[in-house]
Amino acid sequence: MSKHNSVWVLDDDKSIRWVLEKSLSRSGLSTQCFENGEDLLHRLEKERPDAIISDIRMPGINGLDLLSTVHDQYPLLPVIIMTAHSDLDSAVSSYSRGAFEYLPKPFDI
């Protein structure tokens, strides 16, 4: 159901999606990018990646709500949360909802 070594990237910022897609592709990973959580959840009904990288603050469904939904339905699917608004509450919320990892922006690729 999933492509081998596939990572889905969710961020409302086009430049972040572009940078992550280029970097992950150079590492040999198949990458699919999404602008909003609704599209990602719809696609998740049909196929599964090996991991998801998601921003927290986005219009529509935010990254933490997406994380909760994914973790409830697919508890073994790793979700990495990234945010430019890094604080202790965001980190605790991410890990308590099942995040595999928490990345404060900016980060080195």
Model-derived segments and spans:
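Acidic catalytic/metal-coordinating carboxylates
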Residues: 5, 35-36, 62-65
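Two-component/phosphorelay signaling modules centered on CheY-like receiver
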Residues: 14-32
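Short amphipathic alpha-helix used as the core "switch/output" element in two-component signaling
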Residues: 39-42, 64-76, 93-96
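Active-site beta3 strand of CheY-like receiver
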Residues: 47-53
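Receiver (REC) domain active-site loop signature in two-component systems and cognate sites
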Residues: 58
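A Lys-centered signature of the CheY-like receiver
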Residues: 103-105
